[in-house]
């Protein structure tokens, strides 16, 4: 039998959640890192969105992401403090209930046992703070875990329900450590939720890419070529740019003006991007 062809990987998006980013209290590091992680695999980021800790805005952003059919990473807000709303908003966006994920609960208990052991204290599962930590494993029904190599507290993946977009099984999807069911990767994408802490989020995002989307990797599939143009205005270059795109539909033309470049001064970087053959 001929194995089914891998499902296509759609566009990639990023949602960064947290008031601390929008207020400037914390500088976002996720956008450049996600661009780097995707680029190393021949992929690119199509869009990014920043959202504060407003449940209504988070829910709306997640609904748009689910409906887009894109593969989306969402960072932040999956903890168990009052200002963490992402888990609840994800359930609301999907129209499903929240429930304690069995494997997530197991991993969280393992983490609590590790902490007790490190502190030389007995593990007390019924202690109020330990019981509260299990809330970090309360995910939308149907969610699947993303392993966290830093402290075992998992993230989770959700896929569109019928009505938001079909999510069928991916060929060759691997199960996360611990024996969970294989992830479902639909050709309409899904959202992968990770913590806001880079030390946790970035290896988790890499795991998602390498485990769920390796069939989409295409190193060298997107290249750029550009030249520095002096003494020209974008308006005068526009007819040339339009002609290039008209005659070469497989490439995209870009212009990046600069007024105070330390080396070139005032100039325009004019270039094309696309597949290696088309760009050459």
Please provide the spans of the model-predicted regions:
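Glycine- and acidic-residue-enriched helix-capping/strand-helix junction motifs
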Residues: 21-31
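Proline/glycine-rich low-complexity loops and linkers
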Residues: 84-216
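N-terminal small/polar loop signature for handling phosphorylated ligands or for N-terminal nucleophile
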Residues: 29-99, 110-117
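Glycine-rich beta-strand-to-loop/alpha-helix junction loops that act as flexible
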Residues: 17-19, 74-82, 195-196, 273-275
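Generic N-terminal amphipathic, Lys/Arg-enriched alpha-helix
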Residues: 12-21, 40-46, 269
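N-terminal amphipathic/basic leader segments beginning at the initiator methionine
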Residues: 1-14
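A generic structural signal for well-ordered coil/turn residues at beta-strand boundaries
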Residues: 8-11, 139, 150-152, 187-188, ...
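An accessory alpha-helical subdomain
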Residues: 189-280
